[in-house]
Swiss-Prot record:
Belongs to the phage antitermination Q type 1 family. It holds the Pfam family Phage_antitermQ. The gene is quuD. The lineage of its organism: Bacteria, Pseudomonadati, Pseudomonadota, Gammaproteobacteria, Enterobacterales. InterPro entries: Phage_933W_GpQ. This is Prophage antitermination protein Q homolog QuuD. Encoded by the cryptic lambdoid prophage DLP12. GO terms for molecular function: DNA binding.
């Protein structure tokens, strides 16, 4: 079973480094210059894996844009729980629960697609 947080961390690093290639004009325009070098220096996934996850993210945006934006803020932009809590006027605990829900939805989509990712070798849990 894959560690969805590791998957999304690698996808987030890929998206941060390739934001001009990602066709999220509303996001890219709003966050231009806000992506820190800390986020950019993380390990990335390959383009093929990123496109699969981008497809899942597009579906999430269509059905629940709040959860999509939360994942982008956390994994691409690199916002902390506290900064997300301030942005959404709620507690950091609530942000954690919302992130878990969003991560679970993406994980479920990847399971339903039954596609092997190249990064599975690195991100699989050995439980």
């Amino acid at each position: 079973m894959r560690d969805i947080q590791m998957v999304l961390e690698r996808w987030g690093a890929w998206a941060a480094n390739n934001h001009e290639d990602v066709t999220w004009s509303s996001i890219a325009a709003g966050f231009k210059g806000l992506i820190t070098s800390k986020v950019k220096s993380r390990p990335q996934c390959c383009d093929d894996d990123a496109m699969i996850i981008c497809g899942c993210m597009a579906r999430l945006k269509k059905n629940n844009s709040d959860l999509h934006d939360l994942l982008v803020d956390y994994y691409v932009v690199g916002m902390t729980f506290m900064s997300l809590a301030g942005k959404h006027c709620c507690s950091d605990g609530y942000i954690g629960k919302r992130l878990q829900k969003a991560e679970g939805i993406i994980e479920g989509m990847l399971m339903a697609l039954d596609i092997r990712l190249e990064m599975d070798i690195v991100v699989n849990n050995s439980n």
